[in-house]
Amino acid sequence: MSRRSNTVSRPTKPDPIYRNRLVNMLVNRILKNGKKSLGYRILYTALKTIKQKTKKNPLSVLRQAVRRATPNVVVKARRRGGSTYQVPIEVKPSQGRALAIRWLLSAARKRSGRSMGLKLSYELMDAARQTGNAIRKREETHRMAEANRAFAHFR
């Protein structure tokens, strides 16, 4: 067991334009090779596209998409008596939000198309409408947790 004390998680800073922490969390996950300005450009393009297509506030669409893609439970593999069980575990809100962001971005990257900004905007709009691959991933995770509910006491 570690003797170190638990680290205090630093609050993420809000982004410069929308002054929103969620936007900054999304930008930090978009990054490749540390190019933060490119991450901002991709996300702002996506938000601009959302505003043009839906005529709604893009931040509310983003929040709704993340909220709908956030899982309540996940399954973790636990070894017990020589066999591996998928054990359902409840997720903290911050961890769930991080998973939702990760799933939204991976679903956007898998979409066909040229620019990441457009792919991300379509994935966010789909997630806000309860469709899309990120929502499918969440439902699949919930189904797995429900199927393995009998192993919940293995924690």
Swiss-Prot record:
Pfam entry (one): Ribosomal_S7
Subcellular location: Plastid, Chloroplast
GO molecular function, one term: rRNA binding
Main location (coarse class): plastid
Keywords: Chloroplast, Plastid, Ribonucleoprotein, Ribosomal protein, RNA-binding, rRNA-binding
GO biological process: translation
Gene Ontology cellular component annotations, sorted alphabetically: chloroplast; small ribosomal subunit
Protein role: One of the primary rRNA binding proteins, it binds directly to 16S rRNA where it nucleates assembly of the head domain of the 30S subunit.
Family: Belongs to the universal ribosomal protein uS7 family.
SUBUNIT field: Part of the 30S ribosomal subunit.
HAMAP family in the record: Ribosomal_uS7_B (MF_00480_B)
Protein name (database record): Small ribosomal subunit protein uS7c
Organism: Spirogyra maxima (Green alga)
Lineage per the UniProt record: Eukaryota, Viridiplantae, Streptophyta, Zygnematophyceae, Zygnematophycidae
Gene (name only): rps7
